[in-house]
Design a protein with these regions (language model features):
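Non-DNA-binding regulatory cores of transcription-related proteins
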Residues: 112-113, 125-148, 163
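Short, low-complexity, intrinsically disordered N-terminal peptides in bacterial proteins
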Residues: 1-21, 112-115, 175-176
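Active-site-proximal alpha-helix that buttresses catalytic centers in soluble enzyme cores
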Residues: 6, 17-103, 141-142
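Generic beta-sheet signal
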Residues: 23, 65, 110-123
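Histidine-centered catalytic micro-motifs
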Residues: 25-31, 121-128
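Short, surface-exposed amphipathic charged segments that create phosphate/polyanion-binding patches used
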Residues: 102-108, 160
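Domain-level recognition of soluble alpha/beta enzyme cores
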Residues: 139-165, 171-175
């Protein structure tokens, strides 16, 4: 089931091509309860969650996926489970805001001239949940994304209209 939110896009000419951006929000897997916060590591269960979700992502996500992770150790470990190149962006740290996250990925256009872009963000609550709420409901709200889960959004501009669609929500306990 897909959920869609439509709104008017910035003025575009008839010659402007249709574009699409996929955004996957992946909350880091289960981590130790310790301090300092940036140094918290994944638990054994978290490592398993990260590996399972990484396999699902590799099977289902677009192939041109750009991966960006928070500098927190638990997010770095979650990203490494993919065994793919990724970058680190301090704007995605535990205290990130929704505007920080959206700026880091250049939502809804991506930082490319290609017609189709896909970005995977590995980050934290409450930022990921608040971002999901904004994309689907039009305003930030306190939505929760479960540890290790992925929420996949597609944003496209078609005939001058922007549409955001929720393509999938995948919690780690649903993958065996």
């Amino acid at each position: 089931m897909e959920i869609s939110m439509k709104h008017a896009a910035p003025k575009m000419t008839d010659s402007t091509p249709d574009t699409r951006m996929d955004l996957l929000l992946w909350r880091h897997a289960e981590a130790e309860d310790s301090t300092p916060d940036l140094k918290r590591k994944l638990t054994a269960r978290g490592e398993k969650q990260a590996r399972q979700m990484a396999e699902w992502i590799k099977q289902h996500a677009p192939k041109n996926l750009r991966i960006i992770a928070s500098p927190a150790v638990r997010c770095q470990q979650t990203a490494k489970a993919l065994d793919l190149p990724f970058s680190t962006d301090k704007r995605l740290g535990p205290d990130a805001s929704v505007p920080d996250l959206l700026a880091a990925i250049d939502w809804p256009h991506g930082s490319t001239k290609e017609r189709s872009v896909a970005v995977l963000v590995i980050g934290h609550q409450p930022t990921l949940g608040r971002t999901a709420a904004l994309l689907l409901a039009g305003e930030e709200a306190s939505w929760t994304i479960k540890k290790g889960a992925v929420w996949w959004f597609s944003n496209r501009v078609r005939q001058g209209e922007t549409q955001t669609v929720l393509r999938a929500v995948m919690p780690p306990d649903s993958i065996r």
